[in-house]
């Protein structure tokens, strides 16, 4: 058995596209609902409808659950950043031209 050598006539395209997500995707839209019964109601939409033209999740939350939901989005953003670094580390560690001799 030898090493696998692909045919010289068949070269499937291998896209080198970094795994990135638009940071605006993790923003959200909060609107205070003017309800007489409970003035602490908020409508939160993730991602914002004016940025993302697709599926938008909106829910009505009170103030305590609103902070929990925003904290959940913050943790989700950290997880996606770590996943991006694991899948495509060169996107985060490449040297920018002109900064080769720069040190802290």
From Swiss-Prot:
Top-level taxon: Eukaryota
Residues annotated as transmembrane: 63-83
Disruption phenotype: Displays increased levels of spontaneous RAD52 foci in proliferating diploid cells.
An example Gene Ontology CC term for this record: membrane
UniProt keyword Magnesium, yes or no: no
Compartment(s) of residence: Membrane
Keywords: Membrane, Transmembrane, Transmembrane helix
Topological relation to the membrane, as annotated: Single-pass membrane protein
Main localization of the protein described in the UniProt heading: membrane
Job description of the protein: May be involved in a pathway contributing to genomic integrity.
Protein name, UniProt field: Increased recombination centers protein 13
Species of provenance: Saccharomyces cerevisiae (strain ATCC 204508 / S288c)
Species lineage: Eukaryota, Fungi, Dikarya, Ascomycota, Saccharomycotina
Designated gene of the protein: IRC13
